[in-house]
Amino acid sequence: MVNPYTPSQNIIWDPSSLSDARLKTNLTEVTSEQCLNTLRNIKPQTYDRGDLGNERRLGLIADEIEEALEKAGIEVDNVIGQRHWQVDGESDVYKTLQYERLVPLLIGAVNSLSARVQDLESAPKKKRNGAAASKPV
């Protein structure tokens, strides 16, 4: 496969976005709470990328994502990867992060927070209805 990353263009193209249920086996649900707990342990940061001319960037740290997924009990093989990269003339293996593969965590966390908001919004109504029903006539 041709390397989908072109450093000079900063473009990532992933030709393997197939998501048909017929291609998936051994499905395991990741709960909304697991998603929320994972995101709680991730800190967006700004940083300088020395290998790209000290360009100031916003992003995540692959090591933190890896640790947060493990802490939440989520086992995946396709979020954190590795790539040989050359920095200051020396080649080494560095961790990579597939940002788009974090989207399911965002969806799960939004579902969790949405359920909490609904519970909080319905709580005052329940109290008002309960208080009205308990007043003497």
Predicted features, each with a name:
Residues 17-137:
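Intramolecular chaperone/auto-protease modules of tailspike-like proteins
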Residues 1-19, 41:
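Trimeric beta-solenoid/beta-helix "fiber body" segments of extracellular/virion adhesins
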